């Protein structure tokens, strides 16, 4: 097993044992009623929420390569349909960036 995976699993054990997840508790319904489709670029992991002032529970965040909708019956459309029709989303944002990678 990769050393990075081992470290993540060890951290997760401590995280669960000490109930550190409690501070992230929220419902499945996005408080701001927004869904965001964005790129899965690792540089965006913390940058996008920080740049938009969003936190856990605020929005439904959907990420894929390039932040694209590539098929009319694909997982991105399915996720957006669930967000709108089941979770109360009324606004969808598609957010891209330069130098995707």
Please tell me what each predicted stretch does:
Residues 1-70:
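Short, conserved "active-site rim" segments that organize catalytic pockets and cofactor/ligand binding
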Residues 56-101:
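Short HxH-centered metal-ligating active-site micro-motif
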């Amino acid at each position: 097993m990769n050393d990075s995976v081992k470290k993540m699993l060890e951290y997760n054990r401590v995280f669960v044992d000490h109930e550190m997840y409690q501070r992230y508790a929220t419902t499945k319904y996005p408080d701001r009623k927004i869904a965001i489709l964005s790129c899965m670029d690792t540089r965006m992991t913390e940058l996008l929420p920080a740049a938009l002032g969003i936190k856990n529970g605020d929005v439904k965040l959907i990420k894929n390569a390039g932040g694209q909708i590539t098929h009319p019956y694909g997982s991105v459309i399915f996720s957006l349909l669930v967000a709108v029709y089941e979770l109360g989303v009324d606004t969808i944002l598609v957010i891209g960036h330069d130098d995707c990678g």
